[in-house]
Amino acid sequence: MLIVVSPAKTLDYESPLVTHKFTQPELVDYSKQLIEVCRQLTPADVASLMKVSDKIADLNVGRFQEWSEEFTPDNARQAILAFKGDVYTGLEAETLNDDDFDYAQKHLRMLSGLYGLLKPLDLMQPYRLEMGTKLANPKGSNLYQFWGNVITEKLNEAIAAQGDNVLINLASNEYFKAVKPKALDAQVITPIFKDAKNGQYKVISFFAKKARGMMARYIIENRISSVADLTQFDSAGYYFVEEESTPTELVFKREEQH
């Protein structure tokens, strides 16, 4: 079972590291091409392209300039510990043990606009470049055209290495659009998390992102290898709803949070 998640905009390069193991990202030659494009951008370009404040634009112009082809523990940290958005709040990687990290290294991948596909312990220099960014590049007008089949091919390598042909899609639509499901050597299963609000169950972004992280952790901690076991997920009050699920979409619901 291979899990795919989105990255996060919020980053943490300050907290103490809970593991000193690390690996090198595999698609740096592609990242380098994107960095060369991004280094041509002014702060005003970045603010407009990424729809961010001048302060965040300045920060990221600096990051593009400082980015180095050499990834070391001094200028980078493991991706699973550097990302800090809602998904990663649910994942709580800082409390995983060494065996969990080893398992995650084989069974978890993070999609990324700049790095393409990251293993949990891959070193990552700080950046902001979302997959949906309309950044003109040598291969087209956006990052989906830039990455083409590269991410899908890397996922197929990971699927082959970890032993079955099931991919659990815990990524957002924006990121999973960078994957070509028909070319994957796997059955794609997408968990859907719905929260009760005013008497109706719907996907509420903040809760759903956190739940995706919790499910990734559930798979890692419990070494889940079958879809049947996946339906036993019950973290934070979620429960599986069989009658609303299909072979490719697993629906989980939760009562209103007070």
Swiss-Prot record:
GO BP annotations listed: response to hydroperoxide
Cellular component terms per the entry's GO annotation: cytosol
Similarity comment text for this entry: Belongs to the UPF0246 family.
NCBIfam families, per database record: PRK02101.1-1, PRK02101.1-3
Domain of life, source organism: Bacteria
Source organism of the structure: Vibrio vulnificus (strain YJ016)
Pfam families: H2O2_YaaD (PF03883)
Name the UniProt record assigns to this protein: UPF0246 protein VV0659
